[in-house]
């Protein structure tokens, strides 16, 4: 017999550094999920990844207090900042405040990596989404 789903929870957790402190602890604790069990499982699943990389995770918890989780790709903004070698986007994007530049080849690489998480039919559509995110951060797309 299949387990009865009690609900889902979406969090963004840094790879390899899940711990029971806020925001993870309270979010899981109030739903009756074993916090330490999740932290151990998540850290084990992300040990090969770059430490500190933000990982969106969807946790499905069941009425018997068990859970499963699905990890997604890091956000597009993380990849854009990494490729452009910047700490943060422009404070005034679109008003002359440029944070940096990124090439079409870099945009394609990011789009291909994020393809399964984006709502795009093909790579060109995914590239358009990534370019839009880049422009909203104040990055100039060249090439």
Swiss-Prot record:
Its organism's taxonomic lineage begins at:
Bacteria, Pseudomonadati, Pseudomonadota, Alphaproteobacteria, Hyphomicrobiales
Family note: Belongs to the universal ribosomal protein uL11 family.
Listed A to Z, the keywords are:
Methylation, Ribonucleoprotein, Ribosomal protein, RNA-binding, rRNA-binding
Q: How does it assemble?
A: Part of the ribosomal stalk of the 50S ribosomal subunit. Interacts with L10 and the large rRNA to form the base of the stalk. L10 forms an elongated spine to which L12 dimers bind in a sequential fashion forming a multimeric L10(L12)X complex.
Gene Ontology cellular-component terms for this entry are:
cytosolic large ribosomal subunit
HAMAP family cross-referenced by the UniProt entry: Ribosomal_uL11 (MF_00736)
- Record GO biological process: translation
Q: Does the keyword Ribosomal protein apply?
A: yes
Under the heading SMART domains, the entry gives: RL11 (SM00649)
Post-translational modification remark: One or more lysine residues are methylated.
Organism of derivation: Allorhizobium ampelinum (strain ATCC BAA-846 / DSM 112012 / S4) (Agrobacterium vitis (strain S4))
Name the record gives this protein: Large ribosomal subunit protein uL11
Role noted for this protein: Forms part of the ribosomal stalk which helps the ribosome interact with GTP-bound translation factors.
- Its domain of life reads Bacteria
């Amino acid at each position: 017999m299949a387990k009865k789903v009690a609900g889902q929870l979406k969090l963004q957790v840094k790879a390899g550094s899940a711990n029971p402190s806020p925001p993870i602890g309270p979010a899981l604790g109030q739903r009756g999920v074993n916090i330490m069990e999740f932290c151990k499982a998540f850290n084990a699943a992300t040990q090969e990844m770059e430490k500190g990389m933000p990982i969106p995770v969807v946790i499905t918890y069941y009425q018997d207090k068990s859970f499963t989780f699905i990890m997604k790709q890091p956000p597009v903004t993380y990849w854009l900042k990494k490729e452009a070698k910047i700490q943060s986007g422009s404070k005034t994007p679109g008003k002359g405040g440029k944070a940096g530049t990124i090439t079409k080849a870099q945009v394609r690489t990011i789009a291909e990596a994020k393809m399964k998480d984006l709502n795009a039919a093909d790579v060109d559509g995914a590239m358009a989404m990534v370019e839009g995110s880049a422009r909203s951060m104040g990055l100039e797309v060249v090439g």
